[in-house]
């Protein structure tokens, strides 16, 4: 009798289940979307990812974008990197921004909402110069 786990993958008694399926306590199939990105030993990286992103929403967005497998690997690599950085440096930061804003819910405000008032402010040339009484006279030696 051989040992076989819930994933159906028998690897000499070791069940080769990805960190995503392990976290969600579901069967990990050979065609699992997260298997190449989160093998069993990268459980902490999956938890970092899972804090920021929804699994199903991410899968849907990547499919909607129609990325090639290479582009998909690049995107997932960036998302995983961002998640790991965010776990090390939590909280809002200029240095750490959400790389893939397409994965954000629509209710979140755009960064342009913060920049637009600055862009629309009057140019410096429209500000009148200070009164002559405040400017010291130039002296030549």
From Swiss-Prot:
Q: Which cysteines are joined by disulfide bonds?
A: none
Q: In this protein, which residues make up the domain named LOB?
A: 16-119
Classification via Pfam families = LOB (PF03195)
- UniProt record similarity statement: Belongs to the LOB domain-containing protein family.
Family matches, as PANTHER family = LOB DOMAIN-CONTAINING PROTEIN 27-RELATED (PTHR31301:SF21), LOB DOMAIN-CONTAINING PROTEIN 4-RELATED (PTHR31301)
Question: What is this protein identified as?
Answer: LOB domain-containing protein 34
Record the organism.
Answer: Arabidopsis thaliana (Mouse-ear cress)
């Amino acid at each position: 009798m051989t040992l076989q786990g819930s994933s159906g993958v028998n690897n000499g008694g070791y069940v080769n289940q990805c960190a995503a399926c392990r976290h969600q306590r579901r069967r990990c199939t050979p065609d699992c979307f997260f298997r190449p990105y989160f093998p069993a030993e990268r459980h902490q990286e999956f938890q970092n990812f899972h804090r920021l992103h929804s699994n199903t929403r991410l899968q849907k967005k990547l499919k909607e974008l129609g990325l090639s497998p290479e582009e998909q690997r690049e995107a997932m690599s960036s998302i995983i990197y961002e998640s790991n950085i965010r776990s090390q440096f939590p909280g809002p930061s200029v240095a750490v921004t959400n790389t893939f804003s397409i994965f954000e819910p629509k209710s979140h405000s755009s960064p342009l909402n913060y920049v637009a008032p600055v862009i629309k402010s009057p140019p410096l040339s429209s500000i009148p110069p200070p009164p002559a009484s405040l400017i010291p006279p130039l002296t030549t030696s």
